[in-house]
A protein has these predicted regions:
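Transmembrane beta-strands of outer-membrane beta-barrel pores
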Residues: 3-7, 48-54, 104-108, 161-165
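Surface-exposed loop and membrane-interface regions of Gram-negative outer-membrane beta-barrel proteins
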Residues: 7-23, 37-86, 177-179
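Residues at beta-strand starts and edge strands
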Residues: 23-25, 42, 141, 185
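Short, well-ordered amphipathic alpha-helices
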Residues: 25-33, 189-191
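Short, conserved beta-strand segments within well-ordered enzyme catalytic domains
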Residues: 28-30, 43-47, 88-90, 99-103
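Short loop/turn motifs that connect adjacent beta-strands in outer-membrane beta-barrel proteins
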Residues: 31-44, 94-97, 154-157
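Surface-exposed coil loops of outer-membrane beta-barrel proteins
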Residues: 59-88, 96-190
Length: 191
């Protein structure tokens, strides 16, 4: 569970003093498939999320007619609904140098990662996903594969392929696993 309060004490588009609360409930399981079924170096994860509340940036900080560039509460967004956020299997081979992940997950989980140490969206999560309309961050998952190779313990190269499907953003499509609505594929590369 994550809950965030954002307040407007002075200034902004609407300078009335007020606060807004947004939250996210999560339920998930991480599985070590080596311990469960004897599959060497294999893990799986399933995560559901549900977001609720209001964002102080939408009507108090920024002008609602123009929209805002970022959010004061990172946990707000992508609809008030239950979503399948992670549903993947991951396997390491060749002395853990090669790591392959396949399933449903977002680009920001593995590419352009950034810790979330403060509730403002500008300081949280994959920044590409916060500002580019074709890159979906948590809690939106899409069909994906990511292949990472560790060149040295400190250096890796990775490539991914993510189904770019705007219909997954629509209300009621939190568990959509079909490819209908697909516009293409996002292929990030990172060193």
């Amino acid at each position: 569970y994550v809950g965030e309060v954002g307040g407007n004490l002075s200034g902004g588009y609407n300078n009335d003093k007020t606060a807004r609360y947004a939250d996210q409930f999560g339920l998930g399981v991480a599985l070590d498939l080596q311990k469960l079924w004897g599959w060497d170096n294999t893990q799986a994860k399933i995560q559901l999320t549900n977001r609720n509340g209001q964002n102080i940036s939408n009507d108090r900080i920024g002008d609602p007619r123009a929209g805002t560039l970022s959010s004061s509460q990172e946990v707000y967004g992508r609809g008030h609904m239950v979503r399948l956020t992670q549903f993947w299997i991951q396997h390491q081979m060749f002395d853990n140098k090669l790591d392959v992940k396949l399933g449903y997950f977002g680009e920001g989980e593995d590419f352009n990662t950034f810790p979330c140490d403060f509730q403002n969206l500008s300081f949280c999560g994959s920044q590409v996903g916060n500002y580019v309309s074709t890159w979906y961050n948590w809690p939106v998952a899409q069909a994906a594969i990511r292949v990472k190779y560790h060149i040295t313990p400190e250096l890796y190269a990775q490539i991914g392929a993510y189904n770019q499907n705007p219909s997954q953003l629509e209300h009621g499509n939190g568990f959509k696993l079909s490819g209908s609505g697909t516009k293409g594929t996002v292929i990030p590369v990172e060193l």
